[in-house]
Amino acid sequence: MKNTVEKMIRIVRADTGASEVYADMLLSMLPNSIHKVNISYWNYKADRDDFNAMLELMKSSYTDAIWEYEKLVLPYKEELQKYVK
């Protein structure tokens, strides 16, 4: 999971057309996030492997995986919010 999150953050920081969708994906999967999960948008805009990684995370949202994910993404939360409209 760490490699996927790091890759997605690099995509966001590249400031391309994919930055917004990747920032949205990362923020939406945080526990208690105010961002709405928009699977159809992600499916259309994101890389298939990254999309599947987020789906797997959703399936395991009540396990330790979600807390591991939160620890990885939380330090970037403020930065990611700048990319989401």
Task: Provide a role label for each language-model segment.
Residues 52-57, 61-72:
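Basic, alpha-helical nucleic-acid-binding regions used in initiation and control of genome expression
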